[in-house]
Curated annotation (Swiss-Prot):
It comes from Lactococcus lactis subsp. lactis (strain IL1403) (Streptococcus lactis). One of its GO terms (biological process) is NAD biosynthetic process. The keyword Repeat does not apply. GO terms for molecular function: ATP binding; nicotinate-nucleotide adenylyltransferase activity. The gene is nadD. This is Probable nicotinate-nucleotide adenylyltransferase.
Amino acid sequence: MDKGNRKKVGLLGGNFNPIHHAHLMMADQVAQQMNLDKVLLMPENIPPHVDEKETISAKHRVKMLELAIKENPRLGLELIEIERGGKSYSYDTLKLLTEANPDTDYYFIIGSDMVEYLPKWYKIDELLKLVTFIALRRKDTISKSPYPVTWLDAPLLPISSTMLREMFAKNIEPTYFLPQNVIDYIKTEKLYKKR
């Protein structure tokens, strides 16, 4: 296939528990800087590295993502890991995506803190044949990797989903940390309340 007709799609995987402005800014900046057709936010079903007890249902995480991205045409959703079920391994996901979309080049977006863990990723050598890694550089991390990684500079917000869950549990509204429509959804659904 002619390289010029290929789609360029970024993937930002995560638990998104909840989605926040740091996730959104990262996705949008990569879309713009790499001239991607779209960046798809891809919620994990059962992440292999996160304590399941801390993860709310996929239904709520997907709804929050839908609310968060609805105003940005550069962003979309990829629900393959939710639909597939089970543990979410990037290699398995990318194998399915590349087989289903042979006209698409995928760019997997990670924070620079994840680059050092690439050697521990499931089937990393095979994964590298399916995807280009894009890492956003942080001042406090080393921009080196034994694997091919495209490094981008973008402002990174010091926001974490853990911090936001703790704020909600203490009845502190994290205004400006995540979209207001997501805050409203969390409050309506009474998510992240202490039991």
